[in-house]
Amino acid sequence: MLHHEDESSPESDSDFDASELTDKELQEAFSQGKLKPGLNVVLEGKKKPFNDASGLKQSLKDLKNELPWVERLDVTVDPVVDTTGQNGQTDPNTSDINAEDDFQREMCFYRQAQAAVLYSLPRLRKLKVATKRPDDYFAEMAKTDQHMQKIRHKLQLKQASMEKSEKAKQLRALRKYGKKVQVEVLQKRQKEKSAMVTQIKKYQKGLSDKLDFLEGDQTPKKTPNKTGGSAAAQKAKNTPSAKRRYKDQKFGFGGKKKGSKGNTKGSYNDVSGFRGSVAHGKGPHRPGKKGGKNANKRPGKNVRQKMKSKRR
């Protein structure tokens, strides 16, 4: 209980002080006649602003000190010209720099600081002011190298994310274009398929005597003039198509097929398979004839039975 009272006592004291301070303000307002029925404090109107130019100039004169440049070290310079052009800028005009681009903004600060150093160092040397630290001097930078490395890493990550987002936009555009091309290709294939089915139906019904898609030429052939035409064109016209030649090779030319390969003049005159040695019995073997060198030497039935009984 005591501990609880100790903890709550500062809060109660502060509340009491605030209320006491408020009461004092109310008493002062009442004594000044600012309190009226329905109001705690009379609201005063807005104060009219006024421009005291002479007073401001006098204050500036009191604050201003005509000190030498060594004591002030203030310079007003433009950024160094970016000769590399890596940031898309080759002149010192800073109006073209995009303030939202972190790299351009930081590079502008760097170039302006570089210009200030190039302007100030010769003047300091002329005034014989040391510009290099002694060997035993040690002072930490306002921002450590680790902090600057973190900033650099953060800027690089931001730049990489921007490039990644740009690539994603390009990929989305390419996908849209690819889908469009794919739809066009599918429509073209469907159109070709419909045309092929129509040609097949016409061919089955006898309305057409050729199928162009089998020949690989779906473009209509130009008919030569009746009055002229080259000899090669006439020969190509009289030559049967590849489909016709394949069917002729497979099924023949129509008509009777049975017995067409024997007892004809061509087969009678064909002596390519004739062998004289076999025809006149001079060959090594004449089937159907007993005796000779290759006669059947199989033992008789009785001999075979005796041989069989001996084996048992």
Curated annotation (Swiss-Prot):
Q: Which gene encodes it?
A: ebna1bp2
Q: What is this protein called?
A: Probable rRNA-processing protein EBP2
Q: Which superkingdom?
A: Eukaryota
Q: Which UniProt keywords apply?
A: Coiled coil, Nucleus, Ribosome biogenesis
Q: What GO terms in the biological process aspect are recorded for it?
A: ribosomal large subunit biogenesis; rRNA processing
What this chain does, per the entry, is described as: Required for the processing of the 27S pre-rRNA.
- Give the disulfide map: none
Q: What is its main location?
A: nucleus
Spell out where the chain crosses the membrane: none
Q: Does the keyword DNA-binding apply?
A: no
Q: Which InterPro entries match?
A: Ebp2
Q: Where are stretches of biased composition, namely Basic residues? A: 282-312
